[in-house]
Amino acid sequence: MSKLEEIKKEIAKYDYVRLSLCDLNGTYRGQLVAGRHAASYLDNGLNLFEGVLLAGPRTEKVFIDHPKMFNFGSMLSYPDPDTLRPVPWVADGVKVAEMLCESRWKKGGVPQEACPRYVARKQLKRLDELGYKLYSGYEIEFKMMHRDTMEPVFYGQDAYSQRLLQKQCKTLLHIDKNLKDSNIDVERYHPEFGSGLFEAVTKPKYGIECPDMVLNLKQGLMEMSDVKDVVITFMSKPELDNKATGIGAHFNFSLWNQSGDSLFYDADAPDNLSVMAKQWIAGIMKHSKALCAFNSPTVNCYRRLHQPFFPSAIFWGIEDREACFRIKNDGPSGTYIENRLPSGKSNPYLIVASTIAAGLDGVIKKLECPPPGKTEKTENLPRTLSEALEELERDEALVDALGSELVTWFVKCKRDGEIAKYKDLQTDEERFAREKEAYFL
């Protein structure tokens, strides 16, 4: 029996299967299909509107000209059989599974090159062809509130408090058991420096498994909170108060060769960082203004940046929590880069893809890494989404690596589906109210 036939047999054990496609905003879109029919979609794909990747945060319609688009027709969303996993929290007594999908045009059956998962796999393939593997994980922050009052489940900045954690243990332990049963591996949880703010640290994974798992984690947290007495949000800045703590999603990653050796560690270097690590840092620093569009992809994200202890200036440093790129150099297995730019609303597939594209540019071109720390020549990150999108469009190397279709669609999605909604608003209070409507849930 082939692997595909084995998976089809496994699918038949479920009552229902969710077929989920990640759009440009990091939202799962798809359909729930009966388990007895689900296997056929592995061969034939699932019909969805051909522009669904472009949907805005609240499914605002964004349209783009493309030679393969025809009369607002359909494309095909194909499940990846390797992503089959149970989703135990959906309904008691009903067996539900999920598979993650990628989109293809009906004309010719070729990939939609703006599909975030496809773009991430394409960049991972570039690494594989060079003999490298990406090993990565996330620190996912989320804010938890009481559903009846919408007040945070705790106030203050009592980070790491076991007492605060204990008060929410019943909810968190229920959530984590379901996550574990769904093959979503969270290593640890703790309260963070902000009212109602928690962090979930995922177990690092190789390749596409990391962004797959992180999106499943975020989806699971929101879905389980929907049936509990709490509300969970990943909105970057859910309060108008500038002093309120923003919500991030730090991306930790390292490179390894096929023999299992760290490519970022060098025992003989004074700082234990290899030449490749320095070149990679140089690459992501060079492209950081453009990367900001993917790392902080909403209008609201820029309320989080340029605040104390949040990214503002473009520099790196060893164990430096004010740097955009915080470097850990604790031996071969503990040497990695912590990208502190990503917002809680960022799309993990696009973070992985753009990070690889920028880092490889540094390695291939052997870029020289500037010294760590901030100087008078240090440049700042963009202050608005509009500015970040302009930087992305200007970054020819990044556009070439990621593909013009992705960048064109992403920019169109953001300008027409989000930025345009704020042009008629006069006050910051009005703008924030619209941000909360768009990004809170």
Give the role of each language-model region:
Residues 163-171, 188-194, 206-217, 221, ...:
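Short, contiguous, pocket-lining structural segments
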Residues 247-271:
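Acidic/histidine-rich catalytic neighborhood
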Residues 99-105, 198-204, 253:
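Short, hydrophobic beta-strand segments
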Residues 1-188, 209, 213, 230, ...:
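ATP/Mg2+-dependent ligation/transfer catalytic cores
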Residues 105-107, 146, 206, 257-259, ...:
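Beta-strand elements of well-folded, non-transmembrane domains
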